[in-house]
Amino acid sequence: YDWTKSAGQQYFMQQAKKYGVDHFLLFSNSAPVQFTKNGKACANKGVSGSNLADNHYADFAKFLTTTTKHFTDKGYNITLIDPVNEPQYDWTEGQEGSPWTNECIAKLARELDKSITDQGLSAQILLPEACQWKALYQDGTEKRANNQIEAFFNTSNSSTYIGDLKNLKRAIAGHSYWTFGTNADLKDIRQNVWNKAQEYNLDVYQTEWSMLDKEPSTSAGFPSSYDAASYMDISLYMGKLIHCDLTYGNMASWSYWTSFAQEKWGQKNRFYLLRMNTQGDNNNESYGDIQNGGTITDNSNLWVLGNYSRFIRPGYKRIDHITNKEENLN
């Protein structure tokens, strides 16, 4: 191992710890290329199962736990290991990632569980980072890795059941993409995933969202198009989505993707909390090389998220409240 690699990521870990962050999650989009079927960190078209070679599941698990132990020994409190991401997708031709069937995820989880125990770690496994909520509770939503709560936690599914693993977090992780276009989706889909999670006593974690989809409907209170929407319209809708994730989905964790980025192609602030601009930019959009320096500017999205994270602290509990007033998400 060369522990000087990923210096930028390590810098942010150091700064986060300095500012008081006391829980860290380590995630992987792909196994190291020496363990993959095609020697790449993305998959070939038509790959079966996953891009992780069949004889390297234990090796990948050991890589994850060795890395976790290294940072634990350096004083970081690594609470979660997140080994797969959006397993429903193909992840071909250049974008880092791997498809995973439920069977392959279960196989990796079992190896990772053993390796965590062997290394004497306290970190737990978080799964499965579903690309959208429906893949967690129903069949036929995506081309693979569907109905994942049942697959992993129903004992009758012998090939994929992992609910008895000692080091598996009693939570289910997914993403709020593709399910925020209408008020009905914001409510019903989130209630569905919560209801299914409750059958197996699982927390629900929302671990990745930005405004990746066509614009929400005007009936949901959004302008007629992204072109017509202001930066504040986008931020306020993000606040509405967080509210629905917390209240209808009872989600115990919420994360945004990504912290900072360059604004491009008329997308405004759909994909960042902080905007990066390179030297010489004349407006908000930026297409230059950030390695040449520039500026970082906060955005209203940061304050939307901050007004949740500042006032809803770890360990807080929601109190049930029933009202006879008609619900109005707008």
Residues covered by each model-derived region:
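Short glycine-enriched loops at secondary-structure junctions
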Residues: 27-33, 84, 210, 260
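Conserved beta-strand positions
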Residues: 26, 83-86, 127-128, 174, ...
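Surface-exposed intrinsically disordered loops and tails
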Residues: 1, 33, 39-52, 139-163, ...
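Short acidic/His/Gly/Ser-rich catalytic and metal-binding motifs that mark active-site loops
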Residues: 32-44, 88-93, 134-137, 213-218, ...
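Noncatalytic carbohydrate-binding groove/subsite architecture in carbohydrate-active enzymes
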Residues: 57, 69, 74, 96-241, ...
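N-terminal catalytic cores of secreted or lumenal carbohydrate-active enzymes
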Residues: 1-79, 93-106, 110, 114
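Aromatic/acidic polysaccharide-binding cleft in carbohydrate-active enzymes
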Residues: 206-310, 319-325
